Amino acid sequence: MPTIVWTKIDEAPALASYSLLPIVEGFLDGSGIDITTSDISLAGRILAQFPDRLNEDQKVADHLAELGELTGSPDANIIKLPNISASVPQLKAAIAELQSQGYELPDFPDKPSTDEEREIAARYATVLGSAVNPVLRQGNSDRRAPTAVKAYAKAHPHRMGQWTDQVKARVAHMDHGDFFDHEESFVSRGQDLDVVLIGTDGSETTLASGIKTLDGEIVDATFMSVDALDEFYASSLAQANEEDLLWSVHLKATMMKVSDPVLFGHAVRTFLVDVFDKYGDDLNSVGVNPDLGLGDLYTRLEKLPAERAAAIKAAIDFAFAARPALAMVDSDNGITNLHAGNLVIIDASMPTVVRDSGCMWNAEGKRQETLACIPDRSYATMYAAIMDDCREHGALDPATMGDVPNVGLMAQKAEEYGSHPTTFIVPHDGRVEVRCGDEVLTNQQVEAGDVWRMSRVRDIPVRDWVRLAIERARITNTPAVFWLDKNRAHDARVIEKVKAYLPEHEGLDIRILAPADAMKFTLARIRRGEDTISVTGNVLRDYLTDVFPILEIGTSAKMLSVVPLLAGGGLFETGAGGSAPKHVAQFVAEDYLRWDSLGEFCALGACLEHIDQTSEGTKAGILAATLDKAIGAFLENDRSPARKLGQSDNRGSHYWLARYWASELAAQHDDAELADRFSDVATELAAREDQILKELNGVQGSPVDMGGYYHPDEELVAEAMRPSTTFNAIIESL
């Protein structure tokens, strides 16, 4: 029997699953399809790392490893919801919560100095950053807006800020010393590689050894000069001050868990350079690490004598007065862009800047134009191209915009998103060599503090990526653009492979353009209402599948993301919009969850279609077809969660999905048994509408006790997310 694995994850989508999953289980019962769950939440992954410290009844299996093995099976059917990519502050908060619940976990060691602390740090490192996606994404990505979602967005266009040629907001990026500048690339002959740092005194330090590569694998080596980075930040601060722009920094300190926290920390240090220069000894004495942001710094100041802490706070206030205004995350509570590295994440933040006329929030809670700092040129230029296009041609129009689906190269930890184990903060001056035996393959002069990294992409994923791009171009009769820059070392190697693997494609419009040029070409087509497939590497896959959905349909959470696994199974991801902690905060405060589960609905439909194509003896095809019609009715009748208390929230939207789906199943003529089974259910759901909605909406307005944030009490949350006894009884009758 085919089995769907529904992932247990974090925050808003986790809460929504307590309501939605029982409905899905009821509808699939007796269909020849089983459904089970797998815990890959942050708390679950933490507990799985410490079985030796837990009681028998506290131990948790390593579900992520189990799912990783499952991706190698042709029978895999995994619905993967958004999970937390944990920053260090989030990890510490989750550990503290679990400790308070009686789990004897060790503290996270900030600066491990003993073998035991280093071993603990290594275990915790496995759950930091994007620990889940590289394990599960054993295939390339086919991500697009469902037809019904795109049609709804055109009929009900979301708000877009206005653009004129007077808008000063822009992107600032480095022009030397960045990852783009230093990149070297070669194609492996299946060698085992070592990474060695040779000091100025000739001493050798092995940073990594025995790195096994496959024949035809592209290997890159590059580094970020932190001196050049500091120079860039200082220059951009001066520009922002001069032009009265907000200063903002856009990185991905969650996914790029080794490199980007350091880049973020240099932004903090540069902004407060006088404070760190004058009070460095005091700050070091209480363990201040700028990589953790201003929030952590303020917390640690409380450990200093009151007089000393007050002097430092005064110096910080003086720096804020002298610097350009900082972009704010929470103006009411004084939370800035620099408070923590996970608060402003580039793939979500930059599309919002474009949508909001180049603005972010200032300390007064008003929108103000920003200088958006994106240090590395590898991807910054395409964001600059969007803002330049809007400045020249005005805001994009969601009512007429074309569509930009994406085919993304991500299988087998492709490119930068798989580079964490081979990313290093250089401990001293010297040169870093990548060697195979005595053969030196790359050689780069570095200085202490520079961020050096090796990225890789194997040949089979590239072949499959090209195949998938051509397949989507043929099916949709849409131009496909490979976003590759011949002047970037890595991209030049990929271009060689793309040209070698492109099959005969007469009648198809296939292009290879640098990211900025690809963006200009795509935007010109979008403005004419024309569709264009973006074919990108792993990072641009992530960025573009937020940029275009947010501009086209107002959110990336409603995207359909299908990952045809290389082994033949399917991974179905629900949206690209993260796990929405603000939604959880509202739920806890007033029992109202505005998370939109449309992404889950669409992923379930795609999964059922896949099962129908790969398995016999199930009712998956009929379930998928009727679910698709139900989603259409759901959108046409505007049943997504409202944003105001007293109206239907996430739970109410699940009622409407169940009602429309049951109605479609009862009305179809392909399976009499299903029609008969859902006839009474459809009738009951319609007849009890008023009672069900009264029970669902009546609980709103009061605080909710979840019994925990990262590791909530399941009974408490289930009770809160299923408050309608009438609705529950109908679903349980299935």
Language-model-derived ranges and their functions:
Residues 2-265, 274-497, 501-661, 688, ...:
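Extended, well-ordered protein cores
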Residues 666-669:
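Ligand-binding pocket scaffold of soluble enzyme catalytic domains
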Residues 675-683:
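Short, charged, amphipathic alpha-helical segments
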Residues 683-684, 690:
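Short, well-ordered surface patches within globular domains
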Residues 693-710:
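A glycine-biased, small/acidic residue-tolerant capping/turn segment at secondary-structure junctions
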Residues 712-734:
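C-terminal accessory extensions/subdomains outside the catalytic/core fold
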